[in-house]
Every structure is written in C-alpha cells, then in structure tokens.
Amino acid sequence: MNNKTNVLLQAEEMIKPLALEHVPQDSDVEAVIDQWLHAIATDSQFYCNPEISKPEQLKERVISLLQQNGLYTTRNAFFNEVFSALKLKPDFDAKFRFIDLFAGIGGIRLGAQANGGVCVFSSEFDSFAQNTYSFNHGEHPFGDITKVQEKNIPDHDVLLAGFPCQPFSYSGRCEGFEDKTRGTLFFDVLRILEQKKPKFALLENVKGFKSHNKGETMFIALKALEEAGYEPHWTILNSYDYGVPQYRERWYCVAIRKDLGITDFSFPDFKDRKTKLKDIINLSEDDQSLSITDFEKNRIKYHFDNYEKQERVQHDNSMYEPHTKKGRHGVFSFLKPDGSLRFHVGDVAKTQIQEAFYACLETYAPTIIANRVPKLWDIQRKLSVTESLRLQGFPDEFNFRVSKAQAYKQLGNSVTVNVVQAIIENIIKIKD
C-alpha cells in the first residue's frame, strides 16, 4: 500500500525487528506488520506463534515501543492513523471479528464490514489481487494459506472463505471425511475451524459445486464440516435477487458450531429488490477503449434484425427467454482467447452454451467471469470498470492499481457484496 501516513510508515520500521523475532521464519513480514498495526487499532489479537510469545503480551510490548517513540497515544488516535487514508474503513467498535481466506479483492470482507465486523487476518495467493486488496483495505494479505499455521491465526467469531472447487479423494482408504479433503484448500479451512473454533463460517463456491462429481464433492465437504463440530446449511443464491442487475448463481454455506445449540438457519430472501442495467450505467461514458468494433456492431445488428423479423426480439432489444434458455435457440457469442468474438445463431448443444455475452439496459447482465466483460447492445460498448464494480455490489470508491484487464478479471473472480452482506445480517441475528 502506498498511501500510508508518515506515522504509520515510521511505526512499520519500528516494529519490524520484533516481527522478525516473534513470527515463523517463512512468514510474510509485510503482512505480519500490517496485521499487528490493524490489531492495535481495532483492539484485536496479534498474529504470532503462541509457543514463542503470548499474543496479548507481545501486543502490549509493541504498543509500549510505539508510545516511547511518540507514535501511539490513544487507540482512537491510532485508529485514525491506520485508516485515515482508506475510503472503506471498519467501525471503531467492532460487533464481531472475522478472517478472510482466499480473499481475492475483499468482496466478502466488505459484506462483513457493512455489518460492523472487523477483519483480523486475511490471506490471498494471487499477487495482483494482493495489490488491489492492500490498496483498498490497508493491509497486505498473507499469501499461501497452506504455509500458515492455524495456531498463529488470531481468534475470531466468523471464518469467511470463497474456496476453490477441487476434487476430493474417493479411494475409500481414509478413515474420516476430513482425510478425504487432504491436498485441497478446503482442508485448510477445516484445520483452521478445528483449531480456532469460530462460532460461524460462511463459505462460497460456484453453483456447480453442488453437482461436482455427481454431488460427491459437496457431500464430503458437508460431512467434513460436521466432523469438525459444525452444522452446515447451504443453498444456491442469485445476485440478481439481491439488488444488482447480474444473473450470478453461487453456492453458499453457513456452518454453525454445534455447541451453540442453533439448529436452524434461514438464508435471506430479497426477490423484490431487482434492478436493471440502466440503474448502474453511465450513459454519458465516453471512454473510447470501451467501444466495440464495427464488425461486432454489424454482426449484432444483423442477428437482432433477423430475430426481430421472426418476432423473437422484444422492444427493449432483449431476446425472449424461451429461445435462449429452454429452447437453446438464439444468438450466442463466444469469447476467443485473443479477445475477439465468435457468433453462433441457431440451435446449440447444451454443452456448448456459454451465457449470452451481450446485455440490454432493460434486463440484467450475464454472469461476470474472469477474462470476459459483458457488452451493452443498446449503447454498443463494453461495461466500464466502475459499472462492473456496481454489478458486483462494490462501491464506486473502490480503486484498482492494476491493468484494466486485471481489474475485470478480479471482479469476475469476486463475490457479490450484497449477497454476503444479506447472509451475514442473518448470522448476526442468531449470533445476538
């Protein structure tokens, strides 16, 4: 992060020797220092090896060092130093503490912060995503979670993880469901849950997770959560039902620690909060880099004109649903690796279908995925980065210090903030 105050930069240099002394040798020192400074500001626990030093004693030692050098007076003043340069800051008095695993650019984090939560530990492997995360949230996330010892992670109330979908072991030689997850990143979620025992976990994955390997992958994951002492509740939610004009279905699971005695959990239902693309589009946008080619314009016009003659196009320029979903007959576009588009008109085999690439202002956008940006038929251009942020529920204040291509990719890999925020609202209700 390059927008820290002078006090913060001095504090980093001051505590670096202690960080090198009290954390494992393979730790990301930059991430450790940021975590310590945030822990002081938010009154949270330090990341450290508890076998070397007690977290609270180490925290007091660091605060004392900062006080001696005039870098710390009160927590309120230090909180302002840590977060003053950030537009997306947590509350001073946190309602709960969470960790952010496979954090990406922090979409899940924003949903938790909107409910009064404060992040006490974050982890993200991709260096480009780390850059974006650091600039917006003020902390450099830890890297490879497989190298982080669970005992070093600060105490927390909620574990958040948008973990990758990976196949589990089906050899039958394993004694328990947790053993079947070894070698996958879901195993790292489990080992942290078992060591730290947070009250809740919110997990996110692609919709296909429920049917991966004929449902066996999800079955093993849920059983492993039960073995770890948690009661899992899962569902499929669509971002379109939560106030953003994007059709994006994802698998969500809320795992509740069994000893809390909470046997039921209800996912929020906001099906009356639908918006259209026109609600988030800047019609005066004149960025020429968003333009589509004349070839694309002519091809789209040709296909829409033909479909209009066949009465298959509505007046808002959107295709009738039965022709693009049930009948799988319509205009489909496929994005090639070089960024160009290939069109297909007519019947398409189910296995060949990708979601419609073009959207209209009166409808919703297709799912944003990495390396694919929805394009608007009505005004014939690509969505801007800001408009793509809005499709995922991110605030306009969110900033990227990476290329535009990376920004689109990161948003495509992110979660929809609105959905996470709504789920955590319900978690807070049963927590309190």
What do the predicted segments below correspond to?
Residues 1-119, 132, 224-227, 250-432:
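S-adenosyl-L-methionine-dependent DNA methyltransferase catalytic core
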Residues 64-65, 69-200, 207-219, 226:
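Core alpha/beta nucleotide-donor-binding catalytic domains of modification enzymes
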Residues 142, 230-241:
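Conserved S-adenosyl-L-methionine
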Residues 154-155, 245-250:
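A short, glycine/Asx- and small/polar-enriched loop/turn
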Residues 187-188, 239, 384:
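Alpha-helical scaffolding within the catalytic cores
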Residues 200-206, 235, 401:
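Short beta-strands and strand-loop turn motifs
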Residues 206-211, 239-243:
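Short histidine/acidic/glycine/proline-rich micro-motifs that form metal-
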Residues 242-245, 359:
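A short beta-turn/loop motif at secondary-structure boundaries
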